[in-house]
Amino acid sequence: MSPVPVSLAELTARHRDGIVGYLVRLLGDRQEAEDACQDAFLRAHQAFARLGPEANSRAWLYRIATRSGLNAARRRSRRTARAADVDLDSLPAAAGLSPERREELLAIRRAVERLPPRQRAALMLRQFEGFGYAEIAVALGGSEQGARANVYQAIKKLRATLGGARRRDAKR
């Protein structure tokens, strides 16, 4: 549990980069993630006085960021389907990869983007942010059992989707 920081400025300095990274993975777009992060910190500023001394400030802030990210994803899904628009060249980690590996990464990215928003958020918090299930529960506003179920279902769906793609490729 993170102690409540002396100020929102301390909380921002401590967690901003991590939240932006989480939102980039959640949303797949840096500018959209920056906007959602800004919205999250604005909302955190408005609610900071209500943060209790025993509260897990990290999970509290990620809960606000998750809501901002999910709201942004809903707005985007109303406008367009983005999975086909992913440009791996824009990702620094994609430089120098073989065409086959790039296709694998693109398939993974598309499969993750197709997950229901809560499952995607739970998976990102667990796998990339290192959250425990109790922290995920706080961040998503649910129970620890619900957090476990969301991560489990996300992994199960990814395995089914990606396993099916591998079987199809093997038959070619």
Each language-model region and where it sits:
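A short, charge-rich alpha-helical start-of-domain segment used by transcription regulators
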Residues: M1-G21, Q31-C37, H45
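Sigma70-family region 2
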Residues: S2, D39-N56, R75-S77, T161
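Internal acidic/polar
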Residues: S2, R79-L105, R109, G132
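Structural recognition of an alpha-helix C-terminal capping motif at a helix-to-coil junction
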Residues: D35-L42, A55-R67
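Arg/Lys-rich amphipathic alpha helix in sigma70-family domain 2
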Residues: G52-P53, R63-A84, R101, G164-R166
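DNA-recognition helix of helix-turn-helix
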Residues: T66, L70, L140-G164
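Short, Lys/Arg-enriched C-terminal cap helix and immediately downstream tail that follows
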Residues: R74, L115, I155-R172
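A short pre-motif secondary-structure segment
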Residues: A122-R126
